Amino acid sequence: MLSVKGLHAFYGRAHILQGVSLEARAGEVVALLGRNGAGKSTALKSIMGLVPAARGEVTFEGRRIERLLPYRIARLGLGYVPEERRIFTDLTVMENLEVGRQSARGDAPVWTEERLFALFPNLAGMRDRPGGRMSGGEQQMLTIARTLMGNPRCVLLDEPSEGLAPIIVEQMAHSIRTLKGEGLSVLLCEQNLHFSQAVADRAYIVEKGQIRFGGTMAELASDSSLREQYLSV
């Protein structure tokens, strides 16, 4: 589905990603874990073409995409939910969803407004509410829903649980598991290990722009020294 090999990326002269390699298979949830500043968000942005890849390969469904513009990558079926959310605060929930609408490709699930309201029931009663009058958790749900309106086959989620109330985090975890059940692949970057353990099949740990671990969540759970070295705050 999604394969990254030897990815290098820079911010100016700062060498942020230093040979990152990872993959997300069809229908799989993969967590990219690490401390703040480790390179997690940059990895997602580089996959989406928002931060140019200096070296390395990014392959999506058999096609090399590391030289494509972000809008071309999105049209191929790769969705991206940024940490900043970036909803249109003056537009209603329905209008925000309409902005993200694209036709489905191949056998990707077709997401309608009603299916999205079933996935995020909190949004169902807010159809005419402006995005600027929503809580942080509601805005996060709306951002994911808007991305799903593009009918992607793989979704990149940047810190989906950050700053959310515990009950909203639980709802977010349920929604991600539902996406997996629909056959979507999900690559999420997180600092919240507990949340990642609730949703992910496999994990990678990134530290100083390099992958330090790749394996199942069970393997990570059994290695306390690894968690202490790379994930403790």
Can you say where each PLM-predicted feature lies in the sequence?
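ABC-type ATPase nucleotide-binding domains, specifically the catalytic core motifs of the NBD
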Residues: G12, V30, A53, L68, ...
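The feature captures the beta-strand-to-loop junction immediately N-terminal to the Walker
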Residues: L33-R35
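Conserved ABC ATPase signature
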Residues: P130-M134
